Design a protein with these regions (language model features):
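Residues lining hydrophobic/aromatic ligand-binding pockets adjacent to catalytic sites
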Residues: 1-276
């Protein structure tokens, strides 16, 4: 059996609600943490992050350079592909040069680059024309980078899709969320053969505060904890969202416990910060 490495983080890092209040218990960031310092503090506790901002356009090189100055060796950024590629152009030929440009820019992250996520909208339905678009799009993806594709329409979870992605070495993103039923998602596990896997733990977007767990979803997480070891991949990237329970770092900790990994302790960096 392949020894697995679980690389667990959150979806984005810039949340003011994660800053510990002056008179409150540790939340995630030390008291007084500014937005400009959040990534550096984040990287002291977690080893990866999914970047949402890249979905709105390819960042300038200076943005990536700034990130690299704030993270230690071994930290990984996973990047969402610009929506112009996935939502506006729906992977057609107009998206090809934009994808090439994005990949070239992503390479600036070097060993800190994790997975590039191609997140397709629910409107990208499992039709024959869209299947042809997907088949023509996959070969333009460079072999030196790792990719995952997220479908938000259950019709894509069929053998044809699994075979196309496995042959291309591209992971099928596995998502806890309102788009694809969990049982459909879990049935796909046995068909995935790539050496990396990509998991997103998401929820309904009705919560507005993100400083603690507001709804306990331990039962759902336990099901993921049982199924994740069944993946064939040697590396499994997992990203939690605030909207799942109310506080993404707490959800990440729960998954770490389920998978037998050391949990993070926000109080530790709070104590260290108070010494200086």
């Amino acid at each position: 059996m392949i020894e697995k490495r679980y690389i667990i983080g959150c979806q984005s890092w810039g949340y003011d609600d994660w800053v510990t209040k002056a008179d409150g218990p540790p939340v995630f960031y030390p008291r007084g943490t500014k937005q400009a310092d959040m990534l550096e503090q984040y990287a002291r506790l977690l080893e990866t992050v999914e970047v949402d901002s890249t979905a709105y356009g390819t960042p300038p090189a200076s943005t990536f350079e700034g990130w690299l100055e704030k993270v230690p060796p071994g930290f990984h950024f996973s990047l969402k592909v610009p929506r112009l590629i996935t939502h506006e152009y729906s992977l057609d030929h107009r998206a090809y040069p934009l994808m090439t440009e994005f990949c070239d820019r992503a390479r600036l992250l070097g060993e800190h680059l994790g997975i590039i996520l191609i997140q397709l909208p629910a409107a990208f339905e499992s039709t024959k024309p869209n299947g042809q678009r997907l088949r023509e799009f996959l070969p333009i993806l460079p072999n030196d980078l790792r990719f995952a594709i997220e479908f938000r329409e259950p019709g894509w979870f069929v053998h044809w899709t699994f075979e196309e992605l496995n042959e291309a070495g591209i992971a099928l993103a596995m998502v806890e969320g309102p788009w694809v039923p969990r049982d459909v998602m879990f049935r796909a596990f046995g068909h995935l053969k790539t050496d990396h896997a990509y998991v997103r733990v998401m929820g309904e977007r009705d919560l507005v505060k993100f400083d603690r767990v507001y709804r306990n979803r331990d039962d759902e997480l336990a099901k993921w904890g049982e199924c994740l070891p069944k993946l064939a991949a040697g590396e499994v990237f997992i990203y939690t969202d605030n909207h799942f329970e109310g506080h993404a770092p707490a959800t990440a900790n729960k998954l770490k416990r389920l998978l037998g990994l050391p949990v993070i302790d926000p109080g530790a960096i709070e104590t260290q910060a108070s010494l200086f």
